[in-house]
């Protein structure tokens, strides 16, 4: 799929219907789904053949959306200002009011989060009403996908 506004809107429709898609990041491709949806999150675990005990990472577009789900402190904010967006993962305490699927975290009280730097993924995240659960787009224990063709080869028409 080419990266244009029409296809970003198409990706949003897939995600809104609890489907999973491949998304580019500045490191590897991610297998993405609505982090608030148990249905989408279950699909990610199933497609990846990932153990449910291995929590997923969640991608956010900005701090205000993150603050809906996680507690932030000055230490985090200083690191955020220095390193984000980019290839760094933070682990933050979830708020009780968070809508993040408990399946994402294996019912733990913390969440691994990122702010990806890839322009296409950021455009998509900005038009969504939810963050994306998006671990690497590969079967668990296999090499991570670094190109769109790798994702298509790995998952075919399942996403």
Regions found by a protein language model. Name each.
Residues 1-159:
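Active-site-adjacent structural elements in enzyme catalytic cores
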